[in-house]
Amino acid sequence: MCIRDRFEYWAHEACFVPIEDYGLYRHRMLDPAAMGWKYSVKWMAEQGDAVASVLEHIRANGAARSADFERTDGKAGGWWSWKPEKRSLEVLFTSGVLMIAKRHQFQRYYDLAERILPGWHDGLLPPEDQVRRRLLLASVKALGLARAGWISDYFRTKQSRASLAHDLQALVDEGALLRCAVAGWSDAVYVHAEHGELLRAAAAGKLAPTLTTILSPFDPVVWDRRRALELFDFDYRLECYTPAEKRRYGYFTLPILRRGALVGRLDAKAHRAQGRFEIKSLALEEGVRVSPRLVQDVAGAVRRLALWHACPQVEIAQAQPAAFGALLAAALHDGGAAARQAA
């Protein structure tokens, strides 16, 4: 999607990106073969005529959806069973020939990049070292506190350890990054210079996180599973790809962030037609102490999530520990007073 201030592309993953950052991602479009499954050199070689036909259709008729092309391979559709025309649209998108003009009910409308971004030409392309610098600084700033091994994952940049170490040292030398130490860690961590005051406040024990919320599995807090484990001691995986009999927590578990700590996870389903939000399972992390404040914090977060799904009624099918589930159910069924207060 591209509307005034943002466009859609592969950044962290599929993301909405500020339009002023288009040049930072143009390098990827010019070398799409380096982007793994998102682009297929083989497809372009074997299906060149079909790809050209899809492109010509859009050039002549304007923005189009995958649904506007009749499936020609005779196969049944499916979530990941893309028809040839959809695959052609995607390789043209990844290579920057097409952009996403808009979305309607989750369907992408593809159009020519020159029609969506007429002011762009590759003479505006920033040098690669400048792109690398800007993405590195943006990564550290977004992460807050970053080990070197966490940085490249944020924007899926591909950089050798030696090259990254060189760039980090250069940014420290010029004062753009601060190098720090964390008790118990042998390696250095990096903080953006603009966060210097926050860093000093944190070191002095003057920062007190207050937010409690339910995270998406794709939230940057937990997206890098290694970082979530190292920083929060939170071992997380999305189990929708795990056979049902091997799942530990549920099909689509959502992490619970509470006052700066990941304290648990829940698997929920919104039954919107009945206005019912079902917590199929909920589990606190080992060592989390149950307290009235914890109960009210989590109840507030669950209530907000349920109401966002237009489900005023919340039910808890299973919780671990069970006593916490009972306390949470009571807090949720008090008319929402505690949850509204927490909000």
Which positions does each model-derived feature cover?
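Long, charged, low-complexity, helical-prone intrinsically disordered regions
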Residues: 4-343
